[in-house]
């Protein structure tokens, strides 16, 4: 005769508690797994955020350096523009100055040429411009009753004694020596100016013109 055993209410409760515990442990394990995964993902996110922050920091540094470089370039360009404008103004001023000097030089040349022409007619003396400024070469014409007398001369510009003797000879022939000397001086001045460089050297400021020599002062031949 088989014995039929039925579960008591106590056993059912124990079994239910056991199954519940197993279920809770499974849920706990599943929860722990999710928490671990969440923490792992959170760590990855933090590391990614940290890397992003470092990249942002590097970009900000690069941007700051570029901005500083750009500011320097802008300052340089502004300074260059100021210098360029100053140079333009200076060049305009120099252009006006050279134009004025050229005009004055032309005016002076015309005045000298007019004076040379007048003195040449007054003293009846004709100067060989090609020989100047190295030599004083030309001819003085003396009017005569029957015919004119020619007095040629050809001397070194530095031959002060020879020029002095020539002046004395011309004076003895009633030639206005003062005007004759002025003619020679102006012709010499014209020759030196026409042969001078466009931009004379700085030392030229200290040079004296040959016309400053007193042609009447006695000096020995060199």
From Swiss-Prot:
<comment type="function">
    <text>Acts as a component of the essential kinetochore-associated Ndc80 complex, which is required for chromosome segregation and spindle checkpoint activity during meiosis and mitosis. Required for kinetochore integrity and the organization of stable microtubule binding sites in the outer plate of the kinetochore. Participates in SAC signaling that responds specifically to disruptions in spindle microtubule dynamics. The NDC80 complex synergistically enhances the affinity of the SKA1 complex for microtubules and may allow the NDC80 complex to track depolymerizing microtubules.</text>
</comment>
<dbReference type="GO" id="GO:0007080">
    <property type="term" value="P:mitotic metaphase chromosome alignment"/>
</dbReference>
<dbReference type="GO" id="GO:0051301">
    <property type="term" value="P:cell division"/>
</dbReference>
<keyword id="KW-0498">Mitosis</keyword>
<dbReference type="GO" id="GO:0005634">
    <property type="term" value="C:nucleus"/>
</dbReference>
<keyword id="KW-0995">Kinetochore</keyword>
<dbReference type="GO" id="GO:0007059">
    <property type="term" value="P:chromosome segregation"/>
</dbReference>
<dbReference type="GO" id="GO:0051311">
    <property type="term" value="P:meiotic metaphase chromosome alignment"/>
</dbReference>
<keyword id="KW-0158">Chromosome</keyword>
<dbReference type="GO" id="GO:0031262">
    <property type="term" value="C:Ndc80 complex"/>
</dbReference>
<keyword id="KW-0132">Cell division</keyword>
<protein>
    <recommendedName>
        <fullName>Kinetochore protein Spc25</fullName>
    </recommendedName>
</protein>
<dbReference type="GO" id="GO:0000212">
    <property type="term" value="P:meiotic spindle organization"/>
</dbReference>
<keyword id="KW-0539">Nucleus</keyword>
<comment type="similarity">
    <text>Belongs to the SPC25 family.</text>
</comment>
<dbReference type="GO" id="GO:0000776">
    <property type="term" value="C:kinetochore"/>
</dbReference>
<comment type="subunit">
    <text>Component of the Ndc80 complex, which is composed of Ndc80, Nuf2 and Spc25.</text>
</comment>
<keyword id="KW-0469">Meiosis</keyword>
<keyword id="KW-0175">Coiled coil</keyword>
<keyword id="KW-0137">Centromere</keyword>
<keyword id="KW-0131">Cell cycle</keyword>
<feature type="coiled-coil region">
    <location>
        <begin position="51"/>
        <end position="86"/>
    </location>
</feature>
């Amino acid at each position: 005769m088989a014995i039929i055993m039925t579960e008591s209410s106590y056993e059912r409760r124990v079994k239910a508690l056991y199954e519940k515990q197993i279920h809770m442990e499974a849920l706990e394990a599943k929860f722990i797994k999710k928490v671990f995964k969440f923490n792992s993902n959170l760590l990855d996110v933090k590391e990614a955020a940290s890397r992003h922050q470092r990249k942002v920091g590097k970009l900000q540094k690069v941007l700051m350096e570029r901005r500083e470089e750009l500011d320097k370039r802008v300052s340089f360009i502004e300074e260059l523009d100021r210098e360029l404008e100053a140079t333009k103004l200076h060049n305009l001023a120099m252009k006006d100055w050279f134009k004025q000097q050229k005009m004055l030089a032309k005016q002076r040349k015309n005045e000298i040429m007019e004076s040379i022409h007048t003195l040449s007619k007054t003293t009846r003396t004709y100067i060989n411009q090609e020989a100047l400024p190295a030599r004083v070469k030309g001819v003085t014409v003396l009017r005569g009753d029957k015919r004119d007398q020619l007095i040629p001369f050809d001397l070194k510009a530095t031959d002060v004694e020879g020029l002095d003797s020539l002046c004395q000879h011309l004076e003895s022939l009633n030639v206005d020596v003062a005007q004759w000397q002025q003619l020679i001086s102006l012709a010499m001045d014209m020759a030196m100016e026409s042969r001078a460089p466009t931009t004379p050297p700085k030392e030229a400021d200290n040079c004296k013109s040959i016309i400053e020599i007193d042609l009447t002062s006695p000096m020995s031949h060199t």
